[in-house]
Regions:
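Entry beta-strands of beta-propeller and related beta-repeat scaffolds
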Residues: 16-25, 75-79, 130-136, 193-197
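Short glycine/acidic-enriched loop and turn motifs that connect beta-strands
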Residues: 30-33, 86, 141-144, 204-205
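Hydrophobic, small-residue-rich alpha-helical packing segments that form membrane-like cores
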Residues: 21-113
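Beta-rich accessory regions
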Residues: 128-130, 152-245
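Aromatic- and carboxylate-enriched substrate-binding clefts and catalytic-loop regions
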Residues: 103-156, 171, 175
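Structural signature of eukaryotic scaffold interfaces centered on beta-propeller domains
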Residues: 6-19, 65-74, 119-129, 185-191
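Structural motif
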Residues: 33-39, 87-90, 145-155, 221
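Short, small-residue-biased leader/transition segments that mark boundaries at the very start
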Residues: 1-5
Length: 245
């Protein structure tokens, strides 16, 4: 079914039936179309077995990729975000095999200079308050503040099915103002409930022209993310992870 772009989860509750603690890789396979498939590992990631009934999610859309999957306690279901054209689509599943479409986000919000990619969705506390907010990361190419690739973000709420944005539709918030910052991803279950992010340090304006051998540009340093409030708005900030210092 073509090239593979993937993320993984640990199935602590054996919802997929591959065994408690199995590592499940959820990945986009790309050939004449893009579909979502899964593979599982029961030996701590040393080897993976493809699920026999792949793909688990298909679409007629040309761009249908980059799954972000996490467990949502409120509904006791898995949630998957997918980049579909210039929007993010949200699906849910009890077992990582059978997926239900829940909602879409993106039309009329933020920057739309090019295709949306590499979604992420997570909850963070707002510094100095008792409030928590959900952050939706959206990588955009082209259409960044200096052209080419960039990561924008949205602040809002999430109920397990739908993301509701607090921003006005015409407000665009950029995670980083450098040109070499794209395909941002974050890790769940980091120590002390931290949210750690890393990005690809390149830009599709010139990524294919950068001298390379076995890789295509470096990754950024890991950064801890947090939210702060100022002048009636809530914003995302980052700082180098303390392990680097």
């Amino acid at each position: 079914l073509g090239d593979v772009y993937k993320r993984q989860v640990v199935d602590h509750h054996n919802t997929a039936g591959f065994g408690a603690g199995a590592i499940i890789a959820i990945y986009t396979q790309s050939s004449d179309r893009q579909v979502q498939s899964i593979a599982y590992s029961t030996d701590n990631g040393r080897s993976f077995i493809k699920y026999e009934n792949n793909p688990v999610l298909v679409s007629e859309a040309n761009d249908f990729r980059d799954p972000k999957v996490f467990w949502y306690e409120g509904t006791q279901r898995w949630v998957m975000l997918l980049a579909v054209g210039q929007e993010m689509q949200i699906f849910s599943s009890p077992n990582l095999k059978e997926w239900t479409y829940e909602s879409s986000f993106g039309e009329g919000y933020g920057a739309h200079g090019g295709v949306w990619e590499c979604p992420d969705l997570f909850e963070l506390p707002v510094e100095g308050t008792n409030e928590k907010k959900w952050v939706l990361l959206c990588n955009l190419n082209p259409g960044g503040p200096f052209g080419g690739s960039a990561t924008q973000y949205f602040i809002g709420s999430f109920d397990g099915k739908k993301f509701s944005c607090d921003n006005q539709p015409n407000v665009t918030k950029w995670m980083d103002w450098g040109k070499d910052h794209y395909a941002t991803v974050t890790w769940s279950d980091a120590p002390d409930n931290r949210r750690i992010a890393i990005a690809w340090m390149s830009n599709w304006q010139y990524a294919n022209d950068v001298p390379t051998s076995q890789y295509r540009s470096p990754n950024s340093i890991p950064r801890d993310l947090s939210l702060f409030a100022i002048d009636g708005g809530i914003y995302l900030q980052s700082a180098p992870s303390p392990e680097l210092l």
